[in-house]
Amino acid sequence: MNSAPLPEPAAELARKGDTAGLATMLKDGLAVDAQDAKGNTLLMLASYHGKAETVAMLLKARASVDLRNAKGQTPLGGVAFKGYADIATLLLDSGADPLADQGGQTPVDYATMFGRQEILVLLRERRGAAAKPTRWFSKLIGWMRRS
């Protein structure tokens, strides 16, 4: 994890999408990649809560797009789970890895599992044939369909 701690007031601004408030805190010296006790960054929190304007500002401020939390998750993994295609586009345009392993699964796996077709299309556009569910996940889905 990053050594800069993320103050709870900043984390709350990210969750709420208070872009101006966060921009001020960053200008005043808050590290853009500061992490809370669970390893979540401002980018992870804003992404997971669907705050596209805040995500765009954080990316412009050079937030690390693939920095993982304590569970090994990236912002794109969270977005694939939640279904925010607009934020997935922002993250992918900033270099997010659509095949980043998230504890045995990838953003493609999450999008498949939760039926996020629009995100699957984005991921496939970026990675082509490589953007397929992992072998383990494909076997799990096959087993679930047979049960």
Task: Locate the predicted segments by residue.
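Ankyrin repeat structural motif
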Residues: 18-26, 51-59, 84-92, 116-124
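Ankyrin repeat A-helix N-terminal signature
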Residues: 12-17, 45-51, 78-84, 110-116
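Ankyrin-repeat boundary/linker signal
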Residues: 35, 68, 100-101
